[in-house]
């Protein structure tokens, strides 16, 4: 190539880049000038992954509530600190004296968790559901020769030191609902259940509580529900403090004649796991027990040495991260946060996890001035993070060969998967944009990567708080803005 040709090529490249930058700035101006956003707080950043050049921005340093986009900060750090091949384990242990000749144990059987959020999951691919995993555990105990246990089946979730499992500063309204499930050292069935409600035929009548799936031992429900018009959907809420056996259900469900199911969070999954293992041993192998199941925190017995009978392993962390970001699973993100804290400082708490995550990104050159992280999932409304924080973290990921492949594959594809499946149809973003969404009342955010027509990759983050339009309207406006990043 001649010198003149090289100069011409460079000139054309710069011209195309400037044109794209001008078009994006125009789209940002249109978005930020929208009448529905005149009272809103907005932060937008678009950065070149390779060079670190800020392509376009609007209030890039303004910290806002980003909702579930926080999961990207947690999962990226988890892949870096724990590594993509990390697996969680769950152990069957026993203490006391075991007579192999008689099959009698004068001691307890322990279901010792190490934070696996997928244990007994009904939704994680490649994982046995709760009934299946309890069968595996019961079979292992039986094959080890235990037939009579003069003690208890004990659930042990002490791998994490945050006993009640919930995130820092979560709202009361969220705690009993499935997305507010706490993260424990021992989890089961993704720590949620279905509450079955018998619908009533007339407006104002009280639906009847028809049980739970799975059965929740010792949990009672105070029913404050009423029946609303057909088509009103699920407007019920379950209020359950962690480790409490009393729940309040209020709100409305539609009139009808069938069973209406709503999802709630288990108040004590550690005890629930122990209970179901004990029931499985009784029904499948006629194992006898002297005492009922228990949570280790309620045991009040001397701590004795234990021996391990059997170990169950989770899928690789890369697969768990993929489901976390594709389906926005709060429990998985919160478990990762506590595990990071445990691995880095032997303290499995949200605070320790947050400090470890911050230190991880600081070590990679990310400026965290004004960065306030309260949990791992984004459920806390007190998270305050700017779009510049997000793109700086994404750029660090994009230039880290150990993290990037698994992380990028975990992001929803525009128009195809996860929370972006029903967006971007027929636009240039399909096949070129991947992003994690975040939403709560009056909050919307999208953070991810966009591939340019010339193959360059941009990372972006858009956060909007306190818009005045509907959820579908703000989603449409944000979609138009993100499409412009791919044109």
Task: For every predicted segment, state its role.
Residues 55-57, 141, 327, 334-487:
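Small-residue-rich helix-loop
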């Amino acid at each position: 190539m001649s010198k003149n040709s090289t100069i011409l090529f460079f000139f054309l490249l710069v011209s195309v880049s400037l044109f794209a930058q001008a078009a994006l700035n125009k789209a940002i101006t249109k978005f930020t000038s929208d009448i529905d956003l005149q009272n809103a707080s907005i932060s937008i950043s678009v950065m070149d992954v390779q060079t670190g050049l800020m392509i376009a921005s609007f209030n890039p340093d303004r910290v806002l509530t980003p909702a579930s986009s926080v999961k990207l900060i947690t999962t990226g750090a988890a892949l870096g600190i724990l590594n993509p091949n990390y697996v969680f384990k769950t152990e069957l242990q026993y203490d006391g004296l075991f007579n192999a000749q008689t099959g009698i144990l004068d001691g307890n059987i322990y279901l010792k968790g190490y934070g696996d959020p997928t244990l007994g999951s009904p939704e994680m691919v490649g994982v046995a559901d709760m009934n299946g995993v309890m069968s595996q555990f019961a079979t292992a105990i039986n094959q080890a020769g235990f037939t009579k246990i003069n003690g208890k089946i004990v659930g042990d979730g002490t791998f994490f030191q945050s006993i009640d499992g919930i995130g820092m500063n979560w709202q009361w309204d969220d705690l009993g609902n499935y997305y507010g499930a706490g993260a424990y050292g021992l989890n089961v069935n993704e720590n949620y259940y279905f509450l079955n409600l018998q619908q009533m035929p007339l407006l104002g009548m009280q639906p009847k509580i028809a049980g739970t799936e799975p059965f929740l031992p010792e949990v009672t429900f105070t029913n404050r529900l009423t029946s609303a018009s057909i088509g009103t959907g699920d407007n019920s809420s379950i209020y359950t403090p962690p480790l409490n056996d009393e729940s309040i259900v209020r709100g409305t469900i539609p009139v009808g004649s069938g069973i209406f199911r709503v999802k709630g969070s288990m108040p004590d999954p550690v005890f629930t796991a122990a209970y179901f293992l004990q029931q499985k041993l009784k029904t499948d192998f006629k194992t006898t027990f002297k005492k009922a199941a228990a949570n280790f925190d309620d045991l009040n017995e001397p701590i004795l040495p234990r021996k391990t009978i059997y170990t169950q392993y989770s899928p690789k962390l890369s697969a768990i991260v993929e489901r976390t970001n594709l389906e926005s699973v709060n429990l998985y993100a919160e478990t990762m946060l506590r595990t990071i804290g445990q691995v880095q400082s032997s303290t499995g708490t949200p605070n320790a996890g947050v400090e470890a995550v911050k230190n991880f990104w600081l070590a990679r050159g990310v400026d965290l001035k004004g960065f306030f992280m309260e949990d791992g999932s984004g459920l806390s409304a007190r998270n305050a993070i700017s779009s510049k924080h997000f793109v700086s973290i994404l750029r660090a990921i994009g230039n880290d060969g150990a993290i990037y492949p698994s992380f990028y594959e975990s992001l929803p594809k525009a128009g195809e998967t996860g929370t972006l499946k029903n967006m971007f149809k027929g636009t240039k973003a399909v096949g070129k944009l991947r992003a994690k969404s975040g939403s709560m009342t009056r909050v919307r955010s999208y953070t991810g990567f966009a591939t340019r027509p010339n193959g360059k990759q941009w990372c972006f983050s858009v956060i909007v708080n306190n818009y005045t339009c509907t959820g579908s309207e703000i989603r449409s406006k944000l979609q138009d803005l993100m499409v412009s990043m791919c044109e």
